[in-house]
Structure formats: C-alpha cells, structure tokens
Amino acid sequence: MSSADKVLSILSLFTPARPAWSAEDAARELDVSLSTCYRYFNSLVASGLLDRLHRNQYVLGPAIIEFDWQIRIADPMLEIAKPVMLELLRAAQGPGTVLLCRLYRHKVMCIHQESNRAGDGISSYERGRPRPMLRGATSKVILAHLPTRTVANLWRDHAAEAVGLSHSFEAYKAALKQIRRAGYCITRGEVDPDRIGVAAPIFGTGERVAGSLSIVLQAAETSDRLLHRLCTLVVAATRDIAWASRRATRGEPASPGGAAVDRALPPQP
C-alpha cells in the first residue's frame, strides 16, 4: 500500500457510528506508528479533509462539504436525471420519492432524491446514505446484474440483511435471475414498512450496471394498475438517463431528460 493509500485509509475510519477518532486509536486500528499517524492526520487537516476538535479528537472536515457541492453542480448524471425524476413524480398520482443511486465499491449509495411531499417520510434514505445491499428494489435490481461471485460475497458479508428474504443463497440468486429477466424490481416493505419500491437498472460504459432509479410509494395508495404503469415508466426513465449520459460522455448534446417518460405519460387535460 502506497503512502497516499495509507493517508486516505484514515478517512474510511469515520462512520456515523464513530464520527470522531484520536490519532492514538487510529494508529492502533491501522497498525501504524503514532508518529506516522500524526503525520497523516496533519496532512488531512491541512487539506481540510479532517478538522481537529478538543482533546485530540478529529472529525471529517469542511473540504468534504465543498466537494459535495461541486458534485451537485457538476455531475452530468445528476443534471440529466433530475428532470426525468420529476416526470416520474408527476406520474405517481400521490405521495412519492424518486431515488437515484450508484454502485460505489460494495455499497449502493443514494446520490439524489426528489419528493413531492417534503418531510413526510416516504423514504428513510437520502443523499450520501448507503442503502442496504440485499434488501429493497433499489439494491436488488443492481445485484441482479452483478457477477454471481460478487453477489455471493455480498450475501456472505451482509448475512444479517438476508434474514426473512430467502432461506438460502440459491433461492436468493434465483429471485435475482427473475429480476434480471423482467428488467425491473418491485419490493414491498423490505426497507421501510408500508412502502412499495419500483426500480430499474442504469447501465454505464460497456453495458455494466452503474446504478439504479427507483420510486418509493405508500403501499395503501398504490393500485396494481398504477404499479404496472410505473414499472414501464421507470424502465423508460433509466433508458433515457443512460442514453443521454452516453452522449454527454462523448461530448454530444443530449436531449432534455424525461423524453421517454413524457411519451409514456397520458396527455394532460
């Protein structure tokens, strides 16, 4: 591991469960000398990636907030997806939240959400918060397009999440195969109670799965007819996003997001 990798590995120590670290604890955790760890911490503080609190405690620094702001205004996928997500909300016919998520290492990360009912708790997840790997339409539709060995490792590493989903990995793998064939995934109450999730995969370079788009609705207000219609719309939306993203990557102009969803929606009265 290079020195740069060792410095950056310190950032992975900071989690919601443990947001503050001392240099002494970090040195023990990473198995490096205390003097080396202090040198790493000082470099991260100087760059703004860490901030020092009292009593030799460190937390994530303000530079991360600045980077997040830059991503929000410069990420081409976000720019393309936002109008598409708003069109999906228009089709929901009730309270809903649309989530754009990316595959990040071995995590599914929410990078943007749009809701038509702010603060009503339609979905418990938000930007920057990882979603469960094995549960929920958002994650399962991504897993359905990953290599079997990768899914097997995730099943092993996140076994607690699998409780109540399938009695074995083989059964879970068979369910993912059905999702892959269908092109979308529907789940009920797997992440948030009394919620229905509908998701479709977003493919990137080389037709590799890069993320997913999903809509979360209140189960009591979602008819089978609406659910069937939303499946079609979500799949159309992901194709819109993938097509426009490929054009943007090549430096070509992309048509405004939501075109496929617009075509699938009935005309306004």
Predicted regions and their residues:
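N-terminal helix-turn-helix
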Residues: M1-A74, L78, R239-A244, P267-P269
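A structural signal for short hydrophobic beta-strand segments in well-ordered beta-sheet cores
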Residues: L50-D51, L100-C101, I202
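Amphipathic alpha-helical effector-binding/dimerization core
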Residues: L60-D157
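Signal-transmission/dimerization alpha-helices at domain junctions
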Residues: A144, A237-A248
